[in-house]
Amino acid sequence: MKKQFLLSAVLCLSLTAFGQKVHQLASPSGNIRISVELTDQIQYDVTQGNQTLMDNCVIGLETANHQLGIHPKLNKVVRQNVNEELTPIVPLKFSTITNRYNQLLLKFKGGYSVEFRAFDDGFAYRFLTDLKGEQEIMNEILRLNFVDDCLLHLQQPDGFKTSYEEEYRHQTSSEWKNSNRMALLPLLASTPKGDKILMSETNLTDYPAMFLKNDGQGGITAVFPRLPLEFGEDGDRSLKILKEANCIARTAGKRSYPWRYFVITDDDRKLIENTLSYRLAEKNVIENTSWIKPGLASWEWRNAA
């Protein structure tokens, strides 16, 4: 009887652990914490110290045949701690970069995973898929909610065709209306308590850039240009899109998707020093890099070379 009771208790504990709905991830210092909740969708909260910065943020990925992140069924949880030194081929800020983070990989039924990394200066996440053949990506879901009414520093183009040269506008998240123009990345948010949250992306391959809009409910949602199919002439060094697909990308079914990363700091200088984009980039695949030298570049059309 005692053995039966003990076996039942062990089974209950095992099922509870595997059926866990909330998964916690902390940065190496423990100051930044991400709480990932699995309900009918994938949600996460972000805390720095004792202050919650973002809550009820929703992520997902829609293909022509799959709704990844809707009613997620967890298969496996993999955790990893990494501490390594990176050496840039052409140093831009530092000759060596410390890459230290804790990782949470959630593998779901249906051939997809979501990977979170927590650094001492921010966090990042991305989707990974293990699907057959080519996939049509219809949309990537991101609903971002700041807890406080933050001051946003935005570049707002007239459309998806942009040279990223628009002047920055400064308005609170409550002032940014759904009818206003969308914003491009990076986006910088200043909290009332002086923290800075910079959102951007890295490792874009065979995939469009992310833009942001107000969702009409006080949050921020992702927007993407559709896949161009036909182009026409538009001036001496530009093309205009004549026809678009009904998807945002056609890409390999087995791949990793762009990183969505967030720098968190209370010191503006750390924004300039930050190297998250480099730390999250793919490893260099060029075997011989001796020919790569930093130097000057010529902009022919501008200086009439």
Q: Which residue ranges define each predicted feature?
A:
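An acidic-aromatic substrate-binding cleft motif
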Residues: I248, A252-A305
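Sec-dependent N-terminal signal peptides
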Residues: Q4-L13
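Boundary at the C-terminal end of the N-terminal hydrophobic targeting segment
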Residues: A17-G19
